[in-house]
Design a protein with these regions (language model features):
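Charged interaction segments
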Residues: 69-104
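Short, extreme N-terminal segment that most often corresponds to the first beta-strand
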Residues: 2-35
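Short amphipathic beta-strand starts and helix->beta connectors
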Residues: 2-7, 44-51
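A short, terminal or domain-edge coil/loop segment
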Residues: 28, 48-51, 102-104
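A structural detector for beta-sheet-dominated domains
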Residues: 23-25, 57, 64-66, 99-104
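Short amphipathic alpha-helix segments
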Residues: 29-48
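Broad gene-expression machinery/nucleic-acid interaction feature
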Residues: 17-21, 62, 93, 98
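Short, intrinsically disordered low-complexity segments
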Residues: 48-82
Length: 104
């Protein structure tokens, strides 16, 4: 061993990343586009999610994000629900579903 070496080997490991896609149906059409923009802005402050996109496709909100901890999408689903409640003032009976979780 050379000076400064402790005799241990360190293995660098990369965390798995997940791309999660969620959809919220039942959003009133007149608030969908503004809601998508507001939710996107809300997620800009959540640095634990990367490559966030939130769009209104004319009938539903679609949220996509990547992170290294949410292998089943439930954490993002919970945060999406909170953001919808905070960003869309009009009450509605919507439904959030996990469309996909992909390991990157």
């Amino acid at each position: 061993m050379r000076a400064g070496e402790c005799g241990r080997k360190f293995v660098l490991c990369c965390s798995n990343m997940y791309r999660i896609v969620l959809v919220c149906r039942g959003v009133p059409p007149h608030v969908g586009a503004a809601g998508a923009r507001d939710i996107f802005e809300e997620f800009r402050h959540r640095s634990w999610h990367e490559n966030v996109k939130c769009v209104w496709d004319g009938s539903q909100l679609i949220l996509q994000a990547e992170n290294d901890f949410d292998s089943n999408g439930l954490a993002l689903l919970d945060e999406f629900s909170d953001s919808i409640s905070a960003c869309i003032e009009v009450g509605f009976d919507g439904d959030i579903q996990i469309l996909s979780v992909t390991s990157l």
